[in-house]
Amino acid sequence: MDSSGADLDRIEAQRSMLVSHDQRKDFSHSGGVGTTSPTGDTEPVPKFRTNLKLSDLFALPGEDVEMTPEIFGGMSNGEKECLEKLRSNGTPMERVKSNTGDSILHIAAKWGHLELVKEIIFECPCLLFEQNSSRQTPLHVATHGGHTKVVEALVASVTSALASLSTEESEGLNPHVLKDEDGNTALYYAIEGRYLEMATCLVNADKDAPFLGNNKGISSLYEAVDAGNKFEDLVKAILKTTDDNVDREVRKFNLDSKLQGNKHLAHVALKAKSIGVLDVILDEYPSLMDEQDEDGRTCLSYGASIGYYKGLCNILNRSTKGVYVCDQDGSFPIHSAAKNEHYEIIKEFIKRCPASKYLLNRLGQNILHVAAKNEASLTAYMLMHDKDTKHLGVGQDVDGNTPLHLAVMNWDFDSITCLASRNHEILKLRNKSGLRARDIAESEVKPNYIFHERWTLALLLYAIHSSGFESVKSLTIQSVPLDPKKNRHYVNALLVVAALVATVTFAAGFTIPGGYISDSKKPNLGRATLATNPTLFIFLLFDILAMQSSVATICTLIWAQLGDLALILKSLHVALPLLLFSLLCMPVAFLFGVITAIAHVKWLLVTISIISGGFFLFAIFILGPHVMLQRSHLPPSSGIFLKTFMLTIDISELFVILIKACFGCVACSE
């Protein structure tokens, strides 16, 4: 809106008085910084008089006037009539405040009413610097709300107002560097909200604002780097504030002196996985890739830990010296990759620096130790199958432990097989306590049934048996329940399952496929119609086996109800195999019962047979280990079944992941 000198004089006449220079209110909480004019087009805003006094930028003295609900609602709705009401009532607009300390300009800026903001600025320029109870200026409020046009208008107004004053008078009046109660500037809110156009306007208005940190030690520059590729050009504009001819060390010193809070910009770029921003930072300040963060990690270690392959290669292309720089905990970048199971990064390290595979941490552990210790089974598997790293399996740390020792200590059954089967020498090695991996497993396994411990022990013993290193009589040991009450609940659950199987199979025996001969004129009245059908015979055979096995299970488990621990163990050793057998016979009986009825439909017969066969095998590999690992004696030859079960688990997990992915895609499309 345009105005003349006469209009400004009219507005000045409406004011009761002007405060003097020594009565002004100090609104700055962060020190003054000179401003530069913003670039880019902005909305036209009221022009200030060239002879603007400092007193024009501060509110009238006196107490605040409580904002009425009518004025609050009207300003929130963008109604200019509210200003006229305030004028007609003689209410000083500068003193009208809500219960949260918001001025009328705060409210108009919060809801993005551009024209109302312009008019308020024209009449009350002092409100540009007014802060609410949260120490936020209208510029804070507008940026937080994401109103770019309003922000541009406020920035242009502030720049015009300060330009009309002398340098001495304008010092300390820069709202671009004012911080709210959380220590955030308006620029921080713009970047946090990912408003690129708005952030660019604010950066152009004040080049020092991006370096100010909040109460959490996060600066606007840090937040811009964390925003990723979208803010690449803005980060470049912020960092390109010095002459290229200045020495890099001097530029780095200048950056450190200006940047408040967290200074690990390269780490943040890696976290954001923004290769463009990383290039901007390292091109301008190459030494940042050698710095360590608050956890003592170099850029390479941090990139390896999060698995950012492109960023890590970018750093390695610049320099590989960081590969041999350890963190504060004594680990090298290649150890971070092994710990977090990023095998492709390990390969990249070894490709560029072959000697890095021999690096040891403070515990004397190599990458295979670290992988085994942290249950990174896939990494351990790949390293043991690589001829260049396979020999690391016999390495011993400061305690004499091999990777296999550490895997056993952590009961990592996934790593056991590859570590023990790919290098038989590892089975013979003893640590400084004189213990082999087998000794640790057998001594540390708990007496009560804990699946992953007994599973690990069984796989280790099978690997020893397969290698021929020493004899193994059994893959399991006797388990003793610690709580008889919990064991009784387990027995009761088995009784319920066995009773259900017996009931279902008993009923199925009298509702056979094809029914019975009901015609009195035909021979064999009341006999099965398909009695001579071989598939019906198989149906009846497995149905009877399932029923009889379940009944035998019930009879056996009745003994377990007496509470005698020895009887419980012996009953379970008999009942569990019987129940497993009955559960497997039941689906076979069902399959042949269906085949009897639909044998003439070939395609349906094949489909049902394939589906049933798959789930039958799945049931074997799910229920089998549960029964086998509870037996006091399991011959070593059973180990092949356990290894196959491991493969089944991996396939099942992959199948579940695929199903989730498919349903996720369907959900996204909907």
From Swiss-Prot:
<feature type="region of interest" description="Disordered">
    <location>
        <begin position="18"/>
        <end position="47"/>
    </location>
</feature>
<dbReference type="Pfam" id="PF13962">
    <property type="entry name" value="PGG"/>
</dbReference>
<keyword id="KW-0832">Ubl conjugation</keyword>
<dbReference type="GO" id="GO:0009617">
    <property type="term" value="P:response to bacterium"/>
</dbReference>
<feature type="repeat" description="ANK 4">
    <location>
        <begin position="182"/>
        <end position="211"/>
    </location>
</feature>
<keyword id="KW-0812">Transmembrane</keyword>
<feature type="topological domain" description="Extracellular">
    <location>
        <begin position="559"/>
        <end position="577"/>
    </location>
</feature>
<keyword id="KW-0256">Endoplasmic reticulum</keyword>
<dbReference type="GO" id="GO:1900150">
    <property type="term" value="P:regulation of defense response to fungus"/>
</dbReference>
<keyword id="KW-0040">ANK repeat</keyword>
<keyword id="KW-0677">Repeat</keyword>
<feature type="repeat" description="ANK 5">
    <location>
        <begin position="216"/>
        <end position="248"/>
    </location>
</feature>
<comment type="function">
    <text>Dose-dependent activator of the defense response against virulent pathogens, including bacteria, fungi and oomycetes, that acts in a positive feedback loop with the defense signal salicylic acid (SA). Regulates the salicylic acid (SA) signaling pathway leading to cell death and modulating cell fate (e.g. cell enlargement and/or cell division). In response to SA signaling, triggers the accumulation of FLS2 at the plasma membrane, thus priming defenses. Involved in SA-dependent freezing signaling and tolerance.</text>
</comment>
<feature type="repeat" description="ANK 1">
    <location>
        <begin position="66"/>
        <end position="95"/>
    </location>
</feature>
<dbReference type="GO" id="GO:0042742">
    <property type="term" value="P:defense response to bacterium"/>
</dbReference>
<feature type="topological domain" description="Extracellular">
    <location>
        <begin position="624"/>
        <end position="638"/>
    </location>
</feature>
<feature type="topological domain" description="Cytoplasmic">
    <location>
        <begin position="1"/>
        <end position="456"/>
    </location>
</feature>
<feature type="repeat" description="ANK 10">
    <location>
        <begin position="399"/>
        <end position="428"/>
    </location>
</feature>
<dbReference type="GO" id="GO:0008219">
    <property type="term" value="P:cell death"/>
</dbReference>
<dbReference type="GO" id="GO:0005886">
    <property type="term" value="C:plasma membrane"/>
</dbReference>
<dbReference type="InterPro" id="IPR036770">
    <property type="entry name" value="Ankyrin_rpt-contain_sf"/>
</dbReference>
<dbReference type="GO" id="GO:0009751">
    <property type="term" value="P:response to salicylic acid"/>
</dbReference>
<keyword id="KW-0472">Membrane</keyword>
<dbReference type="GO" id="GO:0005789">
    <property type="term" value="C:endoplasmic reticulum membrane"/>
</dbReference>
<dbReference type="GO" id="GO:0071446">
    <property type="term" value="P:cellular response to salicylic acid stimulus"/>
</dbReference>
<dbReference type="GO" id="GO:0009416">
    <property type="term" value="P:response to light stimulus"/>
</dbReference>
<keyword id="KW-1133">Transmembrane helix</keyword>
<comment type="subunit">
    <text>Component of large complexes containing, at least, FLS2, HSP70 and ACD6 in endoplasmic reticulum, plasma membrane and soluble fraction. Associated with HSP70 proteins during endoplasmic reticulum-associated degradation (ERAD). Reduced complex levels upon benzothiazole (BTH) treatment.</text>
</comment>
<feature type="transmembrane region" description="Helical">
    <location>
        <begin position="457"/>
        <end position="477"/>
    </location>
</feature>
<feature type="transmembrane region" description="Helical">
    <location>
        <begin position="493"/>
        <end position="513"/>
    </location>
</feature>
<feature type="repeat" description="ANK 6">
    <location>
        <begin position="260"/>
        <end position="290"/>
    </location>
</feature>
<feature type="repeat" description="ANK 9">
    <location>
        <begin position="363"/>
        <end position="391"/>
    </location>
</feature>
<dbReference type="GO" id="GO:0050826">
    <property type="term" value="P:response to freezing"/>
</dbReference>
<feature type="transmembrane region" description="Helical">
    <location>
        <begin position="603"/>
        <end position="623"/>
    </location>
</feature>
<feature type="transmembrane region" description="Helical">
    <location>
        <begin position="639"/>
        <end position="659"/>
    </location>
</feature>
<dbReference type="Pfam" id="PF12796">
    <property type="entry name" value="Ank_2"/>
</dbReference>
<protein>
    <recommendedName>
        <fullName>Protein ACCELERATED CELL DEATH 6</fullName>
    </recommendedName>
</protein>
<feature type="repeat" description="ANK 3">
    <location>
        <begin position="134"/>
        <end position="163"/>
    </location>
</feature>
<feature type="topological domain" description="Cytoplasmic">
    <location>
        <begin position="514"/>
        <end position="537"/>
    </location>
</feature>
<feature type="repeat" description="ANK 8">
    <location>
        <begin position="329"/>
        <end position="358"/>
    </location>
</feature>
<dbReference type="GO" id="GO:0009615">
    <property type="term" value="P:response to virus"/>
</dbReference>
<feature type="topological domain" description="Extracellular">
    <location>
        <begin position="478"/>
        <end position="492"/>
    </location>
</feature>
